[in-house]
């Protein structure tokens, strides 16, 4: 059993039972999940977007967030200055680079459905699942 850095795209796909959610379960398996401490805020924001677009109801959104809260994910404070450097070099957002920072510093693989983040990670020598 090892640790995996998981991003919001994978967590949300799993929570909403979207295409590929079975893939998430098979990749995660018995591994321990790690993410930057901003993950709950990202999940909350993504849920609110779904509510605003009338894709889910407020009640469903709250239920999804409660489901998220039950997932055992170790939240870690990212090195924000280093993440800003990565963002500048990669022409990316700091939020995405928090995941890259943690994966790089902890020498862990990254699990993301975000193609741009995956390309940036691979360019930086981070293994992606």
What is the meaning of each model-derived region?
Residues 30-31, 71, 106, 124:
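Structured helix-beta-strand junction loops
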